A protein has these predicted regions:
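Non-catalytic beta-sheet/beta-sandwich ligand-binding modules that flank or precede catalytic cores
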Residues: 1-358
Length: 358
């Protein structure tokens, strides 16, 4: 019979070696260490305590299953009868510390969200029977509903105590595997709880009176980084076009507004929809810019006449130029070409009707 004072047959432990005893049913004088077959380790310190009892030390070569066996016919009793095969002794050597992985089906490690609680799963690399909720360290909240799904899987609910960073952790040497090895420290699980809605700090145009050839820089500043925002989809533009807004930090976004041609409208706004959120999933408000005006209808000439069109030497006539609306930048000396005469500088009281003498 093969027995051990250190472990029982079929056990798993982290003993660096085990003491073995080989007990014969009757006296034998030729049982030797070479009659013993082993796997997963080696024997040492073999000795006879009596003609029926022998001892040895078994040292495993590495983690895993080991066997100690005595085959049939390897020794004899005093009557020269060969032995029958012994019942094999089995032992598993495990010196590896168990590890625990912390995951969540609600969020990923490092995420930010507005979930009021998250589901946690603790998965051990091997079976343990003494892992408890008290082995888990948390900050920024509390655990509830702790339960074992199996000898390797445990679940719990984490509820944040307020907005901000939270951590879930398992320090080393909090529980053991079935071999008695203390666990190694888990990789910390981090989650940020955010249930405050993002706001719009400003939504402005660099120019609110746009004419032909003008453009304006549109600047949209959120209170925090946002996700899911696209100016092409989320901003409604009146009587103009807006380039796709860009950002370097997901907080401040800029684009260029170009007024549409042939438009005269004093009342225009940009409108922001509510389809964007902050990183926690909180939706922001709908806002608009201040009013901007557009005047891109080019002025036309209503009339350009001379009072007298049949002039003799020494005669003069009044020249009248009437625009469709007030103009700026007009100078008769620069803008009117005169043939066979001279034109005084034309003047106007309303920038619409201009007169001069030819």
């Amino acid at each position: 019979a093969i027995t051990s004072s250190t472990v029982s047959d079929g056990d798993t432990s982290n003993d660096s070696s085990i003491a073995l005893t080989f007990t014969s049913s009757e006296a034998t004088s030729n049982f030797a260490v070479g009659d013993i077959s082993v796997s997963g380790g080696s024997l040492s310190n073999f000795s006879a305590s009596s003609s029926t009892v022998y001892t040895a030390t078994f040292t495993p070569s590495s983690d895993g299953s080991t066997t100690v066996d005595v085959n049939a016919g390897v020794f004899t009793d005093g009557a020269s009868n060969g032995n029958i095969a012994a019942s094999q002794f089995n032992w598993t050597y495990d010196s590896t510390s168990p590890t625990m992985a912390i995951t969540s089906s609600t969020v990923s490690d490092g995420d930010t969200s507005n979930d009021s609680s998250i589901a946690l799963t603790f998965t051990s690399s091997e079976a343990t029977n003494n892992f408890a909720v008290g082995d888990i360290s948390v900050s920024g909240g509390s655990l509830s509903n702790f339960a074992a799904s199996s000898s390797t899987v445990y679940t719990a609910t984490f509820t944040p105590s307020g907005e901000g960073s939270t951590t879930i952790d398992i320090e080393s040497s909090k529980f053991t595997d079935n071999a008695g090895n203390n666990n190694s420290a888990a990789s910390q699980f981090n989650w940020t709880y955010d249930n405050t809605a993002v706001t719009v700090s400003s939504f402005t145009l660099s120019d609110t009176a746009l004419k032909v050839g003008d453009t304006a820089t549109v600047t949209l500043v959120f209170s925090e980084a946002v996700t899911g925002f696209s100016s092409d989809d989320d901003i409604t533009v009146q009587n103009a076009s807006l380039t796709t807004m860009s950002t370097s930090d997901n907080i401040t976004w800029t684009g260029t507004l170009t007024p549409s041609s042939s438009v005269e409208d004093a009342s225009n706004i940009l409108s922001l929809a509510t389809t964007y959120t902050d990183l926690g999933g909180n939706a922001g408000p709908s806002v608009t810019t201040a009013n901007y005006s557009i005047e891109t209808i080019r002025p036309s000439v209503s009339s350009f006449v001379l009072v007298d069109t049949d002039l003799d030497a020494g005669e003069t006539t009044t020249v009248t130029l009437v625009f469709s609306e007030a103009v700026t930048g007009f100078s008769s000396g620069d803008d009117i070409t005169v043939q066979n005469g001279s034109l005084t500088t034309m003047s106007s009281s309303d920038n619409i009707t201009w007169t001069g003498t030819f």
